[in-house]
Swiss-Prot record:
Summary of the function given for this chain in its UniProt record: G-protein coupled receptor involved in hard keratin expression and likely plays a role in the development of hair and nails.
Lineage summary: Eukaryota, Metazoa, Chordata, Craniata, Vertebrata
Quaternary structure note: Homodimer.
The protein's name in its UniProt record: G-protein coupled receptor family C group 5 member D
Regions that span the bilayer: 28-48, 64-84, 94-114, 124-144, 168-188, 205-225, 240-260
Source organism of the structure: Homo sapiens
Reported tissue expression: Widely expressed in the peripheral system. Expression pattern is high in pancreas, medium in kidney, small intestine, spleen and testis, low in lung, colon, leukocyte, prostate and thymus and not detectable in brain, heart, liver, placenta, skeletal muscle and ovary.
Entry's Gene Ontology cellular component terms: extracellular exosome; intracellular membrane-bounded organelle; plasma membrane; receptor complex
InterPro entries assigned: GPCR_3_C (IPR017978), RA-inducible_GPCR3 (IPR051753)
Length: 345
């Protein structure tokens, strides 16, 4: 059965390999991930029409781009299950870094927006957040394009390179992705500082997601460059190690970031108004305080009596010992005529 599988499928034999079932297991997880990601995309598109809070809505286009990138990661898993050849090698070396760069750039853009929101500032527009995500990933696209073009045109094909060369080049191509990952990690930590508590839950989701991603990347890079050669499992374990890390990280993106974000959006849509706390109470207080200060300034330009009333209403309360008991029955704004004064006596 195993020999028939190899002879009939060639480079695709891992898709039906029952003796080494890692290909079948990862294939099943990737297909399930594709289905779940499509359902989450439809859920986000449905909820986009019901979100009333602009601060929440502005990040949704970037999250849709993030979901499309995760969908691409699950599809890319098949390029690692299939044997390395002239067709799968360029796809691996180009899309792996580009798709992960898009994912971490989207997380970075969201975290950067949260840094403003937790401090009571106004959110970036949705175009600004989306441009940050796309702009941060452009460098990885340029790097991957140049590398694949050079390999394909200079005569040294991927299949002619040694496993050690392939692995080193693969990791070196991902240096910028590692930088994006580290930057997103530190920016997400900055979202923990600020008076608006409700926005911090989004920052915690990004922080935990990136933390698990860092652990996954440290493990698979260590195995690819050091572990497999030491265990004398190179190149047999090279593709399984990278593919397992790819599928695992894609599921981490869904379970630790997208699903909780979708739950938050759903709770927000069930309320009649945006989530309490999204409009930071500190900001509202500061705004009202500024309005009161402006009214005080206008009062100082008017007559002295009006100024005294304004200061009594908005300023520091008058201490009891400073009040003259003989003045308690008089209203400062009104001036009584002599006739009214005599009648009152």
């Amino acid at each position: 059965m195993y020999k028939d599988c190899i002879e009939s499928t060639g480079d695709y034999f891992l898709l039906c390999d029952a003796e080494g079932p890692w290909g079948i297991i990862l294939e099943s997880l990737a297909i399930l991930g594709i289905v779940v990601t499509i359902l989450l995309l439809l859920a986000f598109l449905f909820l986009m029409r019901k979100i009333q809070d602009c601060s929440q809505w502005n990040v949704l286009p970037t999250q849709l781009l993030f979901l499309l990138s995760v969908l691409g990661l699950f599809g890319l898993a098949f390029a690692f299950i299939i044997e390395l050849n002239q067709q799968t090698a360029p796809v691996r070396y180009f899309l792996f870094g580009v798709l992960f760069a898009l994912c971490f750039s989207c997380l970075l853009a969201h975290a950067s927006n949260l840094v403003k929101l937790v401090r009571g500032c106004v959110s970036f527009s949705w175009t600004t957040i989306l441009c940050i995500a796309i702009g941060c990933s452009l460098l990885q696209i340029i790097i991957a394009t140049e590398y694949v073009t050079l390999i394909m045109t200079r005569g040294m094909m991927f299949v002619n390179m040694t496993p050690c060369q392939l692995n080193v080049d693969f990791v070196v191509l991902l240096v910028y992705v590692l930088f994006l990952m580290a930057l997103t990690f530190f920016v997400s930590k900055a979202t923990f500082c600020g008076p608006c508590e409700n926005w911090k839950q989004h920052g915690r989701l990004i922080f935990i997601t990136v933390l698990f991603s860092i652990i996954i990347w440290v493990v698979w890079i260590s195995m690819l460059l050091r572990g497999n050669p030491q265990f004398q499992r190179q190149p047999q374990w090279d593709d399984p190690v990278v593919c397992i890390a790819l599928v695992t990280n894609a599921w981490v993106f869904l379970l630790l970031y997208i699903v909780p974000e979708l739950c938050i959006l759903y709770r927000s849509c069930r309320q009649e108004c945006p989530l309490q706390g999204n409009a930071c109470p500190v900001t509202a207080y500061q705004h009202s305080f500024q309005v009161e200060n402006q009214e005080l300034s206008r009062a100082r330009d008017s007559d002295g009596a009006e100024e005294d009333v304004a200061l009594t209403s908005y300023g520091t309360p008058i201490q009891p010992q400073t009040v003259d008991p003989t003045q308690e029955c008089f209203i400062p704004q009104a001036k009584l005529s002599p006739q009214q004064d005599a009648g009152g006596v």
